[in-house]
């Protein structure tokens, strides 16, 4: 939100009380409390003006929080994000009348407490080093309380004065050339500088500035991240009001933010997920291909069976089949009952699908239409969000007369999850948790008294948590996942998430990728898009290009709106492309499971921006049409019918030993780091480059992701190995568990150097793993 007109003027009706002085402070163990006020000329300036209390804490090492409070008399009805904390890792030094230093790990906050010289400076540096690097901070006029007399609130008489709408404002410094990223799944420009962003979940598709998944956390190229700990609406002006600052404002009396330090983007993400929760793992079968009924298409048992037979006849591997909205009768979403006209024997039919070896997914949302038999029950028992007068909140957008389930009511949660458990008893393996963005936030009440405005974003988290925990209670953590559209802070604990409603265009394919890369910067390690696009019918060329991209995402789903996405309706050559892409992804399962386990521990996503993997190469920071798929594979999707694609190959430390990137499809084709390349590809290839010095476990014998990874296991080694490498082979049945640790190294032989791979527990059997050594030496 913008409050100024240039450097000198304020917008009409705006007043800002800027904090310029530390009136007093108190140090209590790991906490510093300061009372801030305006510029003080004499004692009279303490009257008729605002103060802001600042509380400095450190929830975890390397993270420092500042909480700003104007009025402290408000009700705290929640909700609050769940954050992990520890103690005993801070150091505080205080030079009276001059400064205060608050240290947490390498991160230090230096507060200038000299009269009328208030400044906060966050710096980083190694222990014992005098020279420290500034990350961000508050300089002149950057902490304030804003009053707006133009809002409806200001027209209401409150006591003897008219009340202004208040906002708490914090402006954080930026350095020259600094770039900003993240803030959830955002589909606009990948680099966020110059943008105005509202953290407010909306159902806006992928071609707008709105977002389904708003996360008030951004990462800076300067070596830090900022998390605004506020579940309600957060407004950020990222160099779009003050060109040297990020302006953060929230409606109301308090604002809390945390600065998270890291040597590189991966360390920042690790600390971020230490604070907000580690991403959960998903079952191996979920990495396979998903097929859906699409949205508004007419389908029945016969339609679905025909699709599945078509996949079998064409030797197209399929892991999951999904029933979208119209598995239920129209106007009755959700009643959790199969439409008997279309599925007269739902239980029997689901059993027959399971006999095909398929996992089954089904669509749900957190709403109950008035025509649903469940509406009267929910109304009678108080399971829905209510208006202030006690009536059920309803509207006609989406489902006629629909109500919204109140997940702050434990009884409502039990009622809702009881229907999910019944569906799981029928054979449903997972749920697509759609919607939860259009949540009312005015003139309503929740069962637990939560603040409606703070619940608007948080609601999606509750919804997904309730469904996910229902699944884990029955199937266990290693066999549970969602397919969710909306989320909030901490939602990485309830995977997977997909990009929402995109158009069937190359532009939408590119914006989907931007959204997925941005979301990954919040520790969401799994992500998918609607292959082929959701809105409209994709031309065959686009379908094939999106298949290539979609099968190089962590999760891969064929889904549309009014048209089906089975490949043969776009041409039999589309089936060939799909088959090749699915089989390639299945062969990569050992690699993907190992990368996912690392992401579970560290918060590093499977699909990651180039700068995350190569922060020393400044050319990687603006790149948003290519990505790293795990640590080893560079992917550059093709965004044109003609197949022309331009991509950048980053410099890597490994290249100092004259190692080179190589093509996945042609191991004789080599690429130098630090260069741009333009190529033309048909539909059987795209740029997939293998990192120099990397060891990638693969298995071409696998027919499904959950197959035995050891039978047929091999490794692809690019170039020489400077030191012994350990590769974890993850159990596909329990993706938290490591089956074997493979040790890969070089050794001298009579015939020269060779690469060997040993599996722990396999005595003397060096040949149990096939080695495909490219770029150097011999193949064994």
Swiss-Prot record:
Record Pfam families: Gal_mutarotas_2 (PF13802), Glyco_hydro_31_2nd (PF01055), Glyco_hydro_31_3rd (PF21365)
Residue positions of the active site: 434, 437, 501
InterPro entries on file: Alpha-glycosidase_related, Gal_mutarotase_sf_dom, Glyco_hydro_31_C, Glyco_hydro_31_N_dom, Glyco_hydro_31_TIM, Glyco_hydro_b, Glycoside_hydrolase_SF
Keywords: Glycoprotein, Glycosidase, Hydrolase, Secreted
GO molecular function terms listed in the Swiss-Prot or TrEMBL record: alpha-D-xyloside xylohydrolase; carbohydrate binding; hydrolase activity, hydrolyzing O-glycosyl compounds
Catalytic activity: Hydrolysis of terminal, non-reducing alpha-D-xylose residues with release of alpha-D-xylose
Record-stated family: Belongs to the glycosyl hydrolase 31 family.
Name the UniProt record assigns to this protein: Alpha-xylosidase
Organism: Emericella nidulans (strain FGSC A4 / ATCC 38163 / CBS 112.46 / NRRL 194 / M139)
